[in-house]
Amino acid sequence: MMLANERGACPDAEEMGVMERFSCKMAIAPTASISIICGGTSACIEPIPANIYTHKTLSGSFIVKNPYLEKLLQEKAKDSTNVWNSILEKGGSVQHLDFLSHEEKDTFKTSFEIDQRWLIELAADRTPYIDQATSLNLF
């Protein structure tokens, strides 16, 4: 901020009406690989492809469950192997679970169940605020 006061804002910050010298601060991360290394954070801005899946690594395979769905199932006393197996059989989808409300089913839609035009629209909305690269996978 002191340098900006002394020499003025850099051109891209000035265009946005911000008094800064180093304005390139926004990057979209992590990638899918980095998110695994970071302990299961979401893979960036993309919707999840499944609420449960098997993750294969050199060390072996393990099941990954959506922790928010798992918490909801626990609250509803439906967190059972049978329920998770049915979700797995449906490709990670919860749309077949009759004990979930319409809003809950919408909340846990997989990337394949979301209208892809929304992903494009959301990407367009955030693009002016991203200083570095961004990418988007469509499903």
Spans of model-derived segments:
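Catalytic alpha/beta core of large soluble enzyme barrels
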Residues: 5-6, 26-139
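Short loop/turn microsegments at loop-to-beta-strand junctions
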Residues: 22-24
